[in-house]
């Protein structure tokens, strides 16, 4: 994969140069307070390296979906404040509804080596998501070097992820993207076998391409979560009122056939935990087999299924997981997700990669994050990467 061999911040001289860094500061805010700092922590190594090498560091990011207008509640001001505390030095916030207006120009003109400026939310400008040249040029006018360290938006061709870099002398990746390419890339390109992929989450339709692609590569494919019921239906089981994409049942049959032809061990639920309504206090009932009673919905994997999944995980040398096994937000239906996370965390001689999104949230929430080889910072991006797609934000960077 040519995407794996990209120049990094360590391959270029940054001293005294203005460096525009696209970070992923799309963090959850409550009353102006950041409630989850994972993404800020992820950005620190790159920022600290650039400061230590005497670069003039200009940070940019989007936050939420302001849809091309200035929305005070989506300002990056709280991020500048928190970053200042984390770095132990002032991060100057260029409050500027135009992102690259007078304030931003003033803040970036008088920078000394090692200074840090954070620009306002790039999606305040409607041009951002359309990758329009005028905004890309404005962003580029502030700097000499472009660094992309936002894996979470690497699958988007926007001004701040792709466009701005085209007008600068050098385009490299930061540590975060470098790590993503190393672990996600290596896991898929050269896995130590047995290689097991675990897919969960609500929809088969979100993961059509990824199922197809992984069947070319894996030894075992585990399917759980809401998407499993479409496969169970394809096997002829009753699914009650469980999540079901009836128009994807044929596709599920094709994938089961493909797994057989490729010699891939496809693991599906053999029992589930069901309830008669969707709520945290719903009574969990374990089914005898994979059939769900009429008017009941499957909300988690059953004990026999979990035992099968865990056994396969324990025999693996590479495990990639994307999407929860059940409604892990409800304690009564979190056992499948918890058991998979624990089994992966207990592997000592294996590469374990969590593919962002809900599974990353689940693993961090359950306290297993630091036991994994790598927890990806990108949900959609990691899925597209696993599909073997070229990600625009990475393709645009200079090759080594």
Swiss-Prot record:
Q: Give UniProt keywords alphabetically.
A: ATP-binding, Cytoplasm, Glycolysis, Kinase, Nucleotide-binding, Transferase
In the record, biological process GO terms are: gluconeogenesis; glycolytic process
The record ties this protein, via Gene3D superfamilies, to:
Phosphoglycerate kinase, N-terminal domain (3.40.50.1260)
- What does the entry list under GO cellular component? cytosol
Does the keyword Transferase feature in the UniProt annotation?
yes
What SUPFAM superfamilies does the record point to? Phosphoglycerate kinase
Q: Which residues bind substrate per the record?
A: 24-26, 39, 62-65, 123, 156
InterPro entries documented for this protein: Phosphoglycerate_kinase (IPR001576), Phosphoglycerate_kinase_CS (IPR015911), Phosphoglycerate_kinase_N (IPR015824), Phosphoglycerate_kinase_sf (IPR036043)
Name the Enzyme Commission number(s) assigned to this protein.
Answer: 2.7.2.3
Residues where ATP binds: 207, 298, 329, 356-359
Q: How does it assemble?
A: Monomer.
- PANTHER family in alphabetical order: PHOSPHOGLYCERATE KINASE, PHOSPHOGLYCERATE KINASE 1, CHLOROPLASTIC-RELATED
Quote the protein name from its UniProt record: Phosphoglycerate kinase
Instruction: State the organism of origin.
Output: Clostridioides difficile (strain 630)
Traced from the root, the source organism's taxonomic lineage reads:
Bacteria, Bacillati, Bacillota, Clostridia, Peptostreptococcales
């Amino acid at each position: 994969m040519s995407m794996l061999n990209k120049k990094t911040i360590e391959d270029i001289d940054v001293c005294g140069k203005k460096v525009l860094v696209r970070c992923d500061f799309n963090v959850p805010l409550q009353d102006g307070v950041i409630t989850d700092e994972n993404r800020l922590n992820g950005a620190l190594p790159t920022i600290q390296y650039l400061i230590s090498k005497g670069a003039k560091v200009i940070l940019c990011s989007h936050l939420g979906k302001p849809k091309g207008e200035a929305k005070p509640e989506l300002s990056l001001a709280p991020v500048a404040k928190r970053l200042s505390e984390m770095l132990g030095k002032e991060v100057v916030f260029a409050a500027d509804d135009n992102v690259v207006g007078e304030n931003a120009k003033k803040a970036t003109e008088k920078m000394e080596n090692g200074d840090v400026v954070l620009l306002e939310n790039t999606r305040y400008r409607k041009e951002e998501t359309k990758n329009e040249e005028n905004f890309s040029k404005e962003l580029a006018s502030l700097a000499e070097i472009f660094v992309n360290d936002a894996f979470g938006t690497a699958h988007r061709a926007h001004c701040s992820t792709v466009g701005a870099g085209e007008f600068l002398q050098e385009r490299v990746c930061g540590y975060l993207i470098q790590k993503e390419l190393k672990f996600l890339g290596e896991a898929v390109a050269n896995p130590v076998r047995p290689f097991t992929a675990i897919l969960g989450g609500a929809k088969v339709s979100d993961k059509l391409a990824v199922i197809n692609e992984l069947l070319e590569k894996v030894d075992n494919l585990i399917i759980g979560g809401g998407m499993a019921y479409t496969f169970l239906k394809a096997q002829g089981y009753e699914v009650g009122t469980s999540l079901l994409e009836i128009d994807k049942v044929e596709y599920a049959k094709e994938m089961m056939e493909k797994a057989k032809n490729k010699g891939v061990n496809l693991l599906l639920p053999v029992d589930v935990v069901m309830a008669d309504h969707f709520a945290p206090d719903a009574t969990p009932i374990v089914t005898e087999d994979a059939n769900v009673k009429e008017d009941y919905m499957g909300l988690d994997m059953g004990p026999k299924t979990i035992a099968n999944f865990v056994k396969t995980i324990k025999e693996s040398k590479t495990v990639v997981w994307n999407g929860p096994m059940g409604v892990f937000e409800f304690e009564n239906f979190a056992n499948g997700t918890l058991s998979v996370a624990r089994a992966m965390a207990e592997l000592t001689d294996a590469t374990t990669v969590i593919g962002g999104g809900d599974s990353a949230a689940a693993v961090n929430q359950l306290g297993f994050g630091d036991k994994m080889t790598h927890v990806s910072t990108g949900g959609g991006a990691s899925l597209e990467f696993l599909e073997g797609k070229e990600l625009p934000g990475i393709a645009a960077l200079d090759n080594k």
